[in-house]
Amino acid sequence: MHKFRYSLHQHYSKRNSSDKSKDSPISQNSNEENDSTKLSSSSLQDLHDDLDDIYNNYTLAQGTNNNSVDTLDSENNQAINKFIDKPPAIHGMEPQLPVMHVSSRLSSLGNTTNETGESIAKSAPGTPLSSHSFDFRPHHPRAVTNSSLNVLLDTPNVSSEFNHLVDQTPPNESVERFDDSNNTVDNTEEEENNDDTDEIPKSETLKQNEENWEKKGAAVKTIKTMDGEMKTIRRNVTDFKFGKELGEGSYSTVILATDKITGKQYAVKVLDKRHIIKEKKVKYVNIEKHALNRLSNRLGVISLYFTFQDKDSLYFVLDYASNGELLTLIKRYNTLNEECTRHFGAQILDAIKYMHDNGVIHRDLKPENILLDDKMRIQITDFGTARLLEKKNDESEEYPVDVRAKSFVGTAEYVSPELLENKYCGKPGDVWAFGCIIYQMIAGKPPFKATNEYLTFQKITKLQFAFSAGFPTIIRDLIKKILVLQPSRRATIPEIQKHYFFQSVDFKDFDSIWLSDPPEIGPYKMTAKSMMKVPELNKAPITTVIKKNVKKSTNSNSNTNNVATAVGGSSSNGHKGSSPTPEKEPSPATINNKSTEKVSAASVAAYVLNKPATNQNSSTSEDSSKRSSNSNETRKLSYSQQDYIPGTNILRPQISTRPSVGSYVKTTPSKDRKTLTKVPSNIHQQQEKVKPKVMEVKPATTLEAAWEPYLTHPDERILRIGPVIAHKEPTEPFEKKNKASLHISPLDINKEQRSRSNTSLLTQIVNEVNNNTSELKKVENADESLAIIEPQYNMKRSPTSDSKKSMDIERSASTSGSRISKKAIFKKLGFSHLEKNDSEESNGPSLTEKPQTCTLVVTTHGRALLFIRNDIESNYLLIAEIKLKYPFIHFQELVISQTKFSKLVPSVGVFVISSIDNSLIFEVEKFEVNQWTEALAKSKYNEIGKR
């Protein structure tokens, strides 16, 4: 029941004129205005009469149509709403009270009057039915839009009109007149309208208003026909038949629609005006429209045909891509083969170039925004976050390369590092996303993927990505040139087009890129061809070295030319182990004259090693030449064949050819012959210079003085010291559990530590193993106990380590054997507490049982010391010493923290010192991880450089 609100004051004051008020509501209003008599005492009978009078006035009035909704005021006090279809009152019929279904939300609504005097409906604040929530929709809306789904509903949202019209059937006469005036309606439509009991009748004014919107918001396009005549095309909502929903975005819904005139299918993007303004998306809608206007009518980019609107929505009529998204294709096959990657990659690259040439930066390139049409050609869509560039000046036809970004846009896995760190967005950002897409086609997943956006951004800024086993070498080389942190060093579109991977693609031929049939689509399978090195990178540098040696040696001696060719690796004599014997030894004067020229150190060394001895026979010289050539070949192989991909036994691709050994030695003019006879000693100097540069010893500070008892050499200094939370786990299960989260760290080591012709850390470690074969012939045969020393646990067996290695370290066989056997017996019997004293002695702080708060000290002599103490007053206890010089000791960063604080405190970082059997895991602040791993790497290579 409605709450009838009526003023008793008005009815008591007009008690004397109650009879007149029944006949005429006008006289009643005059009595209400002129009567100012005060309330007087009355009997119960008078009150009863007044109530009857109220009821009769509301329900039994003749000749009037009382259309009140929430109040009992007469119709003269109501604001007229011209959008409500009110059936006329029929004389002689007594109107019945409508049966109302009142919800909890609509029952509290009332009519208010604005400045213009029109009635405005109110609903709960912030709901889609609230007309006061939006400034541009004051009254008479036609449709309700769900803000999350953006689905248009054919239901009015003015609540007062809803209260009046729901469940109220208009008279038969009006229905008949409506049917007579609309003879064009089909019978099927009449049946559907009759079945739809929830449909609300619309007034003629509302219908006329909608028709005006259709005309006013229609799209008008002028085209030129084949006959040369100009033809105007007009399209609006009624010209399309809408079908299934294709997808939805953040502020729009894409629906498949068919043009009723031509029968062509389009993808219509429906954008609700209310939601756009409420969510402040007007800017992005305008950007998308202007970007599509710049780029339409060209293969590779979705085309915009019409834009029109009605009272509630905007409509973008776009190309219909029947084969869906590129991401769906990748997920269907898990990966794509190299031919598909080349075909689609060339189309994407050509489309990006077209966008950039027209001053549009997409900024959100990803497989979800790349569609495939009916002929499997790519179409880039979703330009809502694009950046439109302005030309540098009025005369220039070029657009700037990058601009300052005021807002963060894009998807986490594909966003460029310069946008994260410097807030710059430009053309290199789209190239970065292109590299990520190429990677995803082959690997099946983006290169930078983590559990949340924060960790993903950390991976991007640190360039932490890895190639899966069997990743094609040529594509790997391409991605390495694209995924570069500095935009200025990143490969440009012309450089990518000239890459060996796209060698078979003619980017100048438009038809070969866009009109050729796509290759057979299938998953990527590793083949011998895919793992071959890039031919152009292998041939060019070697050829130049050979020419250089030939040119510089022909002037002095033809025999030296042959020797240089053998050293270069192109001659077959070098492989056979023989070299020609020089006919004549050059004089010192000749050597001095030629010393002013730049002579390759490798050719000089080869000449001296193959020079015949004066006091020896020819057989001795031949043997020495064989040994020298073989040593040169093995030295080259040791430097070129040991660069493996981390975690696999696959060689890393040789992106830049390594210079010869002689390039590391400064060539100086030789003054006498003695300098040439001492070349073998210079070779040892070359090997020493190849090693990392030793850090300069700085004066000792109070820090070294405090930790002097634990420093083994007067020159040993402390690189870093700080608190850590450490524990120990077996290496194999730990790496299996965190296989996808472990990454080699640090990635940005200084060039001084990577002085071996810019080789990787793993290559340096392997080369160090080859240089120290006297100590460790094989990494597999190395003993971890030499690298990780635990003084407090030599008499204690670690429950997680292998039994053989941990039981035999500095242990007395008789004592330890009896103790272990006694413990084992009592443990089986359940009386292990009898050995309480022994257990108390051995139960010190253990890194295997639970994480311990320790102090880690890293020194310049390749040592990492781990200390622990119970309280502040007690002394430090050395529980572990790690010698970092061994090749099986390496450092990693665990990207996904497994601590209990990972959900609450995302700043916790983890780094690992891994060995053969055990790994030490350290928890520190997130920003300290790179600092610790850099200190460990410096310590390691400083110790290696001194050897």
From Swiss-Prot:
Name the Pfam families on file.
Pkinase
Say if the entry is tagged with keyword Kinase.
yes
GO terms of biological process kind:
endocytosis; filamentous growth; intracellular signal transduction
List where Basic residues composition bias occurs. 1-14
Positions annotated as active site in the UniProt record: 364
Q: Which organism is it from?
A: Candida albicans (strain SC5314 / ATCC MYA-2876) (Yeast)
Annotated stretches, region: Disordered: 1-43, 108-132, 162-212, 550-598, 611-644, 660-686, 794-816
Q: Enumerate the Gene3D superfamilies for this protein.
A: Phosphorylase Kinase, domain 1, Transferase(Phosphotransferase) domain 1
**GO cellular-component term (any):** cell cortex
Record field: compositional bias (Polar residues): 108-117
Q: Where is the Protein kinase domain?
A: 240-502
Membrane: present as a keyword of the record?
A: no
The name this protein carries in UniProt is: Serine/threonine-protein kinase PKH2
Query: At which positions is ATP bound?
Result: 250-252, 269, 319-321, 325, 368, 382
Q: Where is the composition biased (Acidic residues)?
A: 187-198
Tell me the PROSITE patterns matching this sequence: PROTEIN_KINASE_ATP, PROTEIN_KINASE_DOM, PROTEIN_KINASE_ST
Q: Where in the cell is it found?
A: Nucleus; Cytoplasm, Cell cortex
- Recall the GO molecular function terms of this protein's record: ATP binding; protein serine kinase activity; protein serine/threonine kinase activity
Bias class Low complexity marks the residues at: 550-579, 618-632
What does a knockout show? Sensitive to cell wall-damaging agents SDS and Congo red.
Instruction: Give positions of region: PIF-pocket.
Output: 271-316
